[in-house]
């Protein structure tokens, strides 16, 4: 069994940066993620949205940011495994960690970094008629490519920021936008809701009852007023159900980690209570420190965690390995 210096669990932006940084610190790394592509929420939930709070970018498309991070993560040739979920971790007698995946594979490492984000991401579904039948054939839970919705009659279900933002972002390319929400109050930002009413047909107190199609694509959607039960049939080409995503942590709460709710508790060094196991990003929380789910902060945590992992492996090395320009120059 190959032995790694570090196994990074989670292929979102924080896990990707940690993979790069571990390579910069001359650590052999395995990056493992449950999704079928790297990038985490950047590609799974909001690939077509702009990100403005990452240093060095006045604004960058989430998908493009993910691609840059993936390219950076691969600089030092880490091993990468996708569509594989870490089911269990075990400490060996020689103070190594063995992770076991849902596919029955086992991998050994000196240290582990948990960059799990919100966990394995799955969309929240309504359970409407025809929803599953037409999934990815007209029923969607996110927008991966705006061009796929050009000149489409689009029905959006939801009242949060994602639903309203998709309506606004797709309006310039869509043939028409209709948005339904089961209440008359929106969770989205007030200015966005005001803009929504200018670009879309909005039906409050309405829910989706059924999606209809011709067997290969969506052609209609049946909505109803949840107060009067009156139904309406809309001619549509696409239905976007934007009512949130669920994060599944699987067996993580049973690994012996100190946790608070869904968060893994760490100290200022990003160390968990398990020796050689670190956490960074949305999954990590420090007692007494305000939690800010920002990519920029996660990058810093990833650098600290990987540096502490390096120090754990070799107590004689400096925690700060030097500036990247100096490190790269020394390797050339």
From Swiss-Prot:
Quaternary structure note: Homodimer.
GO molecular function, a single term: NADP binding
Organism (species): Sulfolobus acidocaldarius (strain ATCC 33909 / DSM 639 / JCM 8929 / NBRC 15157 / NCIMB 11770)
InterPro entries: FAD/NAD-bd_sf (IPR036188), FAD/NAD-binding_dom (IPR023753), Fd--NADP_Rdtase_type_2 (IPR022890), Ferredoxin-NADP_redctase_2 (IPR050097)
Binding site for FAD: 33, 41, 46, 86, 121, 282, 325
Keyword match rRNA-binding: no
Reaction catalyzed: 2 reduced [2Fe-2S]-[ferredoxin] + NADP(+) + H(+) = 2 oxidized [2Fe-2S]-[ferredoxin] + NADPH
Gene3D superfamilies per the UniProt record, alphabetical: FAD/NAD(P)-binding domain (3.50.50.60)
Record protein name field: Ferredoxin--NADP reductase 2
Cofactor binding, note field: Binds 1 FAD per subunit.
């Amino acid at each position: 069994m190959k032995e790694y210096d570090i196994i990074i669990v989670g292929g979102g932006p924080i896990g990707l940066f940690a993979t790069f940084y571990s390579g910069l610190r001359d650590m052999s790394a395995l990056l493992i993620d449950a999704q079928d592509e790297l990038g985490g929420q950047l590609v799974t939930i909001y690939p077509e949205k702009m990100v403005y709070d990452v240093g060095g970018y006045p604004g960058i498309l989430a998908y493009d940011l993910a691609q840059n991070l993936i390219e950076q993560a691969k600089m030092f040739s880490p091993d990468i495994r996708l569509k594989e979920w870490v089911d269990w971790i075990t400490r060996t007698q020689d103070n190594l960690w063995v992770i076991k995946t849902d596919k029955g594979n086992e991998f050994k490492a000196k240290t582990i970094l948990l960059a799990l984000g919100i966990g394995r991401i799955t969309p929240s579904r309504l359970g409407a008629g025809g929803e599953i039948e037409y999934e990815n054939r007209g029923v969607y839970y996110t927008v991966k490519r705006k061009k796929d919705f050009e000149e489409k009659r689009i029905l959006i279900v939801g009242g949060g920021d994602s639903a309203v933002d998709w309506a606004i972002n797709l309006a310039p390319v869509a043939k028409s936008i209709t948005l339904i929400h089961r209440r008359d109050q929106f969770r989205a930002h007030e200015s966005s809701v005001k803009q929504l009413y200018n670009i879309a047909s909005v039906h409050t107190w309405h829910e989706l009852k059924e999606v209809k199609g011709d067997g290969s694509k969506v052609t209609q959607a049946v909505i109803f007023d949840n107060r009067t039960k009156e139904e309406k049939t809309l001619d549509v080409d696409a239905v976007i159900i934007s009512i949130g995503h669920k994060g599944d942590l699987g067996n993580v709460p049973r690994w012996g980690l100190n946790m608070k709710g869904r968060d893994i508790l760490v100290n200022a060094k990003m160390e968990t209570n398990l020796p050689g196991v670190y956490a960074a990003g949305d999954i990590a929380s420090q007692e007494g420190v305000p939690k800010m789910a920002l990519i920029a902060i996660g990058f810093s945590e990833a650098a600290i965690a990987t540096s502490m992992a390096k120090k754990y492996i070799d107590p004689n090395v400096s925690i700060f390995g030097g500036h990247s320009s100096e490190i790269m120059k020394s390797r050339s």
